Every structure is written in C-alpha cells, then in structure tokens.
C-alpha cells in the first residue's frame, strides 16, 4: 500500500467541534483507507496524519465528513532515503 501524509488545517474556532465529532463518530474512514499515526502542531491548529491506501480517491470520500471544519492536503510519500550503511 502507498503511504500518504495528510495535513488537516482546522478552520478558526472549529477545534471544539472537531473533537466533539471525533469522539461521537470516530475517524469515519471508508473501507480501504487506513490510519497509521498522527501528530498535532504545537498550537493544535493543524494535524498531520500518516495514512495508507491503494485508492487515493478514498481521501475525498473521507473528507466529505470533515470539510465543514477545515481543509485537507494529501501528500503521497515516496521511499525512505537509504543511508550509505543501509543495505
């Protein structure tokens, strides 16, 4: 599966609504889109999520559940660079 970094930028004043929805309904991911890990920016206005899927169109399906609360950027990740001592 390909991995993606998802950058969610929360709309001003929407953080309480985001967490309320998340606690009530979960991530609401469609089948085939897998959450791996996430990190919040220090001020909490952006969330960086590592996800994987073989069908990047699923991001749009997922974002329909959240688009009223922010915007999303999806970045396809490449292979991890290898150091000279790695085989």
Model-based region annotation:
Residues 1-46, 54-58, 78-87:
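Short S/T/G/P-rich N-terminal loop/turn motif that feeds into the first structured element of a domain
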Residues 63:
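Short, flexible helix/strand-to-coil boundary loops that buttress conserved ligand/catalytic motifs
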Residues 27, 66-73:
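A common structural junction motif
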